[in-house]
Regions:
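Enriched for short, Lys/Arg-rich terminal
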Residues: 1-6, 10-24, 55, 63-86
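A short, surface-exposed loop/turn module that caps and links secondary-structure elements
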Residues: 28-54
């Protein structure tokens, strides 16, 4: 059972701002989310919908929709910025 990982335009812009090393690690993580949307280390967020996974100093915030087998990435950013309201 493989999930579809959806990257909205806003997330694609966030990815474009990352350095090559961080981008490579995050891309690997996104590929892993296709097979296992709740990998070890992923945590349910408190106070808002979604999950988060650590990728070095970066965080990937996403929602899981099991009925339609989708993982929608909400935000990708540095750990100091990603939890702040925009």
């Amino acid at each position: 059972m493989s999930y579809v990982v959806i990257l909205p335009r806003s997330v694609q812009k966030q990815l474009a701002k990352l350095d090559a090393a961080a981008l490579g690690r995050i891309e690997d993580t996104l590929l892993e989310l296709q097979e296992k949307p709740r990998p070890s280390g992923a945590k349910k967020l408190k106070g808002r919908d979604g999950w988060r996974i650590r990728v070095g100093d970066y965080r990937v915030i996403y929602e899981i929709h099991d009925r339609v087998l989708q993982v929608i990435v909400i935000q990708i950013g540095h750990r100091r910025d990603v939890y702040r309201d925009s």
